[in-house]
Amino acid sequence: MKFFVDSADVAAIAELNALGMVDGVTTNPSLILKSGRNILEVTKEICNLVSGPVSAEVVAAKAEDMIEEGRHLAEIAPNIAVKVPLTWDGLRACKVLSDEGRMVNVTLCFSVNQALLAAKAGATFISPFIGRLDDINLDGMELIADIRQVYDNYDFKTEVLAASVRTPNHVADCARIGADVITAPPAVIKALANHVLTDKGLDMFNADWAKTGQSILLK
């Protein structure tokens, strides 16, 4: 399973990338706002930092305008994935951009039917949102499993990119289900290393080692 970082924080992305943890990056207008950076400048910097796909989102509402924005974003770097919303206009833009050979990430997916349409329109990635479904008492993970099954049934090449990933449990569940990609904030990815028993065991080993009076570095 590939790990994408859901962030426009270049320093945070670089930290994870140095450990080989980054297979790609996703951004959105809210993350660009949080970064305080110009969208074209920060996206180019991220594209230069990582070799995998970097999703940059259009903001237009009409297909023709989405296509124009998408082409402009795609000029930033060859690893740009143009991010479009799962609306009828977004699907029209997806078809045109994908036919032009551009990577397209169709975002804000909340149903299997939407995911089917995105795959038929040539999406490179479909982004179902787990956490936002959980927020309204629906099962976000069930959607991931359903999309995985349907895509496998019909051999769609669109990759399932699980988004709105908020907890380490979300990541583990996506891995078990077979999501192709998860995208998560840096804090969630770093939290994958945490376990209370790891901390407890390390404390015990350190305490016992201190009692030996030894040093590994002294001959």
UniProtKB/Swiss-Prot annotation:
Pathway: Carbohydrate degradation; pentose phosphate pathway; D-glyceraldehyde 3-phosphate and beta-D-fructose 6-phosphate from D-ribose 5-phosphate and D-xylulose 5-phosphate (non-oxidative stage): step 2/3
Active site (UniProt): 83
Compartments in which it is found: Cytoplasm
Keywords: Cytoplasm, Pentose shunt, Schiff base, Transferase
Reaction(s) catalysed (UniProt annotation): D-sedoheptulose 7-phosphate + D-glyceraldehyde 3-phosphate = D-erythrose 4-phosphate + beta-D-fructose 6-phosphate
Pfam family, one: TAL_FSA
A biological process from GO: pentose-phosphate shunt
Gene Ontology molecular function: aldehyde-lyase activity; transaldolase activity
GO cellular component: cytoplasm
Principal location class: cytoplasm
UniProt cross-references to Gene3D superfamilies, sorted A to Z: Aldolase class I (3.20.20.70)
EC number(s) from the headed UniProt entry: 2.2.1.2
Family label: Belongs to the transaldolase family. Type 3B subfamily.
HAMAP family xrefs: Transaldolase_3b
Role, per record: Transaldolase is important for the balance of metabolites in the pentose-phosphate pathway.
Protein name as annotated: Probable transaldolase
